[in-house]
Swiss-Prot record:
PANTHER family: DELTA-1-PYRROLINE-5-CARBOXYLATE SYNTHASE, GLUTAMATE SEMIALDEHYDE DEHYDROGENASE. This is Gamma-glutamyl phosphate reductase. The lineage of its organism: Bacteria, Pseudomonadati, Pseudomonadota, Gammaproteobacteria, Moraxellales. It comes from Psychrobacter cryohalolentis (strain ATCC BAA-1226 / DSM 17306 / VKM B-2378 / K5). GO terms for biological process: L-proline biosynthetic process. Its main location: cytoplasm. GO terms for molecular function: glutamate-5-semialdehyde dehydrogenase activity; NADP binding.
């Protein structure tokens, strides 16, 4: 399918929204078996279309390289055998998850005689705007279907062919089980005006989930009239406390930084307690550079004093600037700062971090508990890599995004994050006095 520009974007989007709203009402009433059948039907169609999808992705990758797409976006754009298999497994995982819809909690009797509680229900229609990552098309669709929501997906132009190939499979799977084809709509236009329409269609769309660069998220947050679930960036920290286990400190730091660069849960700043910096920082820095010889370390004055004469690190070191403490690199670059202790670490993270994911490496229980209480982030970890901040790793099956907001959903947003609760009341003819 080739890229198309809709001449009347407003009319096109109004129709998309209207169909999504109608589909959402049917989905809200669908039972768990029907939703799981749809997911597995999509799985089977997708599995048989592997070569077509990978071929479409090759077209996108070739275009991305010709258009000088940066390395982080190319990494997110690529679909290989392992990522394709992960997409298939993700569908199975979501199908296996408990269905939150219809769950009733907090039932209680009131003195008036009424019996009341809360029932979990879908949000309705989800609008998603994202860059690269064609696997997100499938993950978002599967979570929306399982949680009883219709979804409108607007991927980036760089992933157009991949997204349309996946959309074709989703549509066929839905048709195979008799579910509305408008339950999942992948926009067939690259016109940016479609985004402006989507984020202002309050009569049809209940929530917007943007995933992409900081500029995209800022624009959506500024212009949207529909509520937004978002995070701006992932400036994640690892703090090596004076009571850290050296082996854990080294292994976690290497994994958090070098496992993948193009992800929002990758460590961007390493903080080290000055009490152990002389002994431990060189070992950590050497291990990180050994893991990736392209690594560049940007150091504060104290870190420079410790590392500048290290021959192994020659060519990998430079002085940090004030901007480095606020930067999500998405690249083999790591900022390193030496601190006086946990007080300064917490202050630095809460000042410069993005409230995404932050880690402390320590064997001191008291300090670990203080860190998780006082660091203001969606995920706070003790002795584990920030790379675990992920819906799949958290047992959510998949995630539609990660939220650093504090209202409605925070952290990886899975099925429950795509629902709300309504009050239900049972009575026997009670009237209010």
């Amino acid at each position: 399918m080739s890229q198309t520009n809709t001449t009347d974007v407003t009319a096109y989007m109004q129709n998309v929204g209207k169909e999504a709203r109608a589909a959402s009402r049917a989905l809200a009433a669908a039972n768990t078996g029907d939703k799981n059948a749809a997911l597995m039907a999509i799985h089977d169609v997708l599995k048989n279309a592997k070569q077509d999808i990978l071929a479409a992705n090759t077209v996108d990758m070739d275009n991305g390289q010709k258009n000088d797409l940066d390395a982080a976006l190319l990494d997110r754009l690529e679909l290989n055998d392992a990522r394709f298999d992960g997409m298939l497994q993700g569908l199975k995982d979501v199908a296996a998850l408990p269905d939150p819809i219809g769950e009733v909690t907090d039932m209680t009797y009131r003195p008036s005689g009424i019996h009341l509680g809360k029932m979990r229900v879908p949000l309705g229609v989800v609008g998603m705007i994202y860059e690269s990552r064609p696997n997100v098309t499938l993950e978002a669709a599967s979570l929306a279907l399982k949680s009883g929501n219709a979804i409108i997906l607007r991927g980036g132009s760089e992933a157009f062919e991949s997204n349309q190939a996946i959309a074709k499979c989703i549509l066929e799977g839905l048709k195979n089980v008799g579910m509305s084809e408008y339950s999942v709509q992948v926009l067939e236009t690259t016109d940016r005006a479609a985004v402006g329409e989507l984020i202002t269609m309050t009569e049809y769309v209940d929530v917007i989930v943007p995933r992409g660069g900081k500029g995209l998220i800022e624009r959506i947050s500024r212009d949207a009239r529909v509520p937004v679930i978002k995070h701006l960036d992932g400036n994640c920290h690892t703090f090596i406390d004076s009571d850290a286990d050296p082996e854990i400190a080294i292994n976690v730091s290497v994994n958090a930084k070098t496992h993948r660069y193009g992800t929002c849960n990758t460590m961007e700043t390493l903080l080290v307690d000055e009490a152990i910096a002389d002994e431990l920082l060189p070992k950590i820095a050497e291990a990180i550079v050994e893991a990736d010889n392209a690594m560049q370390l940007r150091l504060d004055d104290k870190a420079q004093a410790i590392l500048n004469d290290n021959t192994i690190l020659k060519g990998h070191l430079s002085a940090a600037t004030a901007e480095d403490w606020d930067t999500e690199y998405l690249a083999p670059i790591l900022a390193i700062k030496i601190l006086s202790g946990i007080d300064e670490a917490i202050e630095h993270i809460n000042t410069h971090g993005s409230h995404h994911t932050d880690v402390i490496i320590t064997d001191n229980y008291t300090k670990s508990q203080r860190f998780i209480r006082e660091v203001d982030s969606a995920s706070v970890m003790i002795n584990a890599s920030s790379r675990f901040a992920d819906g799949f790793e958290y047992g959510l099956g998949a995630e539609i995004g990660i939220s650093t907001d504090k209202i409605h959903a925070r952290g990886p947003v899975g099925l429950e994050g795509l629902t709300s609760q309504k009050w239900i009341v049972y009575g026997h003819g009670e009237t209010r006095a």
